[in-house]
């Protein structure tokens, strides 16, 4: 089906992204996978190419473009290239809105220029060893000491945790307040008592550094509070729809790409004296996946447009995240199966797509949490 949501400007941007991937990412990606981390030079290159801070106002060095379709193009092309390790979506679409929407003028001038050049890499630290989806379980504290915050606690599974120069930390500022006693406080590289643990060894997305973070009596200036004190819960809920849309966009793009490479494979691979594509079972498998992808694509494109226009609600963002990522997981499994033993070999793209994509139904809100949000809203 012909997609109708992109203009010539979006198409030109897509070509820019593809050129960037070809020149600056793919030649180095295998080394990054071995190293378990992307080079900082790649971030600087992304900044020079104008791929960072797409929605940041021009006065702070950004693109000044809040059209989410550009972010969708970026997510689609990085997914198709099999290069999720350079986490531009995390930087642009998850942390970016907190800085542009909540930061004071002084904070914007301090942080946003580096955000857009790639000199300042960002992360957000919510998850803790004992608190994932349950924000009320957060134990990291930020004690008001008059002229500074004193932060103690730990975080885990933090994307960009090793590289990050600026970490948005979710911490308790009113311990008895539960989820409504949380605040967002920015901790910068070099803060005394702020330590990074090991770069965690994951089954996929190995070049995307994921770390434990530790805070031992970390003194943070009072002016590093982001947004309202005790306002983190509302701030997080406001921005989660965009995070989930970014994940959903990558999910359907991955499913479509897996279907594409598997369709090519079954046409070329022979068994029992003929191409696999001549077997009825194979044709049924391809037909089912193609139909599921087409239906999901139609829904996702509608959600992309709605989000670009500011009309997408949390329920439909949750539907998109749940459905697209679960589809990605199913398609990855079926496509690997159709590759037979070759699908289990790391040199085949389907193998890496299988392991890289498995996290999609977990981070940004698990499938189970998405269903809870949808069901709770419909039955309220």
Question: Where are the language model's segments positioned?
Answer:
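Alpha-helical interface subdomain recognition
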Residues: 1-85, 102-107, 114-119, 134-135, ...
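Short glycine/proline-enriched turns and hinge-like loops at secondary-structure junctions
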Residues: 65-66, 134-136, 160-164, 178-181, ...
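Short Gly/Pro-enriched turn/cap motifs at secondary-structure boundaries
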Residues: 88-90, 115, 130-133, 157-160, ...
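Helix-loop "lid/cap" segments that line or gate small-molecule binding pockets
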Residues: 93-102
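A short, Trp-centered hydrophobic/proline-enriched beta-strand micro-motif
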Residues: 118-126, 170
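Flexible, small-/acidic-enriched active-site or ligand-binding loops
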Residues: 137, 190-221
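A short core secondary-structure module
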Residues: 148, 152-196
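Long, acidic (Asp/Glu-rich), low-complexity accessory segments flanking structured domains
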Residues: 213-235
């Amino acid at each position: 089906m012909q997609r109708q949501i992109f203009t010539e400007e979006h198409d030109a941007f897509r070509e820019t992204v593809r050129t960037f991937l070809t020149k600056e990412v793919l030649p180095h990606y295998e080394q990054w996978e071995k190293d378990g981390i992307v080079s900082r030079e790649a971030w600087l290159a992304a900044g020079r190419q104008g791929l960072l801070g797409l929605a940041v106002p021009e006065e702070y060095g950004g693109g000044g473009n809040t059209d989410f379709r550009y972010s969708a193009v970026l997510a689609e092309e990085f997914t198709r290239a099999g290069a999720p390790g350079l986490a531009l979506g995390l930087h642009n679409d998850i942390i970016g809105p907190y800085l542009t929407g909540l930061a004071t003028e002084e904070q914007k001038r301090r942080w946003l220029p580096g955000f857009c050049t790639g000199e300042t890499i960002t992360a957000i630290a919510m998850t803790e060893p004992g608190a994932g989806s349950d924000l009320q379980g957060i134990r990291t504290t930020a004690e008001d000491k008059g002229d500074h915050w004193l932060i103690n606690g730990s975080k885990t599974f933090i994307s960009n945790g090793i590289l990050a120069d600026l970490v948005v930390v979710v911490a308790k500022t009113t311990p008895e307040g539960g989820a409504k006693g949380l605040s967002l406080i920015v901790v910068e590289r070099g803060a005394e008592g702020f330590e990074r643990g090991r770069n965690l060894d994951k089954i996929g997305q190995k070049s995307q550094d994921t770390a434990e973070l530790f805070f031992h009596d970390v003194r943070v200036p009072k002016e590093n509070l982001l947004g309202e004190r005790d306002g983190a819960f509302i701030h997080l809920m406001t921005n989660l729809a965009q995070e989930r849309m970014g994940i959903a966009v990558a999910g359907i793009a991955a499913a479509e790409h897996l279907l594409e490479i598997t369709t090519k494979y079954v046409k070329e691979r022979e068994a029992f004296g003929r191409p696999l594509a001549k077997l009825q079972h194979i044709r049924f498998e391809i037909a089912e996946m193609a139909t599921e992808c087409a239906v999901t694509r139609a829904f996702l494109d509608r959600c992309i447009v709605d989000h670009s226009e500011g009309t997408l609600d949390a329920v439909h963002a949750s539907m998109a995240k749940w459905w697209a990522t679960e589809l990605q997981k199913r398609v990855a499994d079926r496509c690997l199966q159709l590759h037979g033993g070759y699908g289990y070999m790391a040199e085949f793209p389907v193998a890496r797509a299988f392991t890289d994509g498995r996290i999609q139904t977990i981070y940004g809100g698990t499938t189970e949490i998405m269903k809870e949000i949808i069901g709770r809203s419909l039955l309220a």
